[in-house]
Amino acid sequence: MRLINFDETSDWFEAFHRLEALLDKKRSKGKMVVFIDELPWLDTPRAKFLSAFEHFWNDWGAGKHNLLLIVCGSATSWMLDNLINNKGGLYGRTNCEMHLHPFTLAETETYLHRRGVTLDRYDVVQTYMLTGGVAYYLSYFQPGLSLAENIDAIYFAENGFLQTEYDRLFTSLFADNAGYRRIVETLSENRYGLTREALAEKAGIALGGTLSNMLKALVKSDLVTIYWNFGESKRTQYYKLTDMFCLFYLGFVQRNPTNNRTYWYDNQNRSRSEERRVGKECRS
């Protein structure tokens, strides 16, 4: 049921005023829930969405004790800068954060099984290592195909579902994503991670608040992990790329020079042939 015709509203201020009027008409003493999905994408240039949203909550919503406002968004940097760490009209307004994490290895196995994708545990581990347990990526695995056939169809075939996902990932998570990509791609070439200073030098990004904020957003997005080396000072932090999809994409998909659409299947067969050859040499 469409309760508000947004085609007839002149701006976001009017849209929120209409929402207020609609909720006032209900005069409900029970809990009322307003859910706004993908909040960052509503804040387009010159839309003044954030100002209207602040006005809606501070002047009306915050005083409604039976109103629960739930917002979500995949653009991590926007959510951090404009909502969670807001220093303006929305400062300190969030009551609870819910960070959605990917599936664990066990949950990945259960999900695949319930979708009818039959893989042995070795292949389930490989699947987890190239998807990171992200349900969206796992949803493209088709029953009846081997792991190699699924990987080729999803990552390497023409119009493969996840062939361009790397670009979409950064566009959806970060508004100005060039710096984030440089950080991730630099870390992908340094498997043991880098200190903040070494990362700044290798990625060509100046040390300072901008780099710090980008690293915080990457950590919050589960793309990068902070760790400390045993025996070193606690002040020496290392940043390591741990997102499995990015590692697989940068390590294999981006480096597929021949654009071979059966790359993984062929690579698997070559590996098996090499194993058989080595085995014969060892026995002779």
What residue spans do the PLM features occupy?
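Phosphate-binding site recognition
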Residues: 1-269
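Conserved small/polar residues in nucleotide/adenosyl-binding loops
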Residues: 275-282
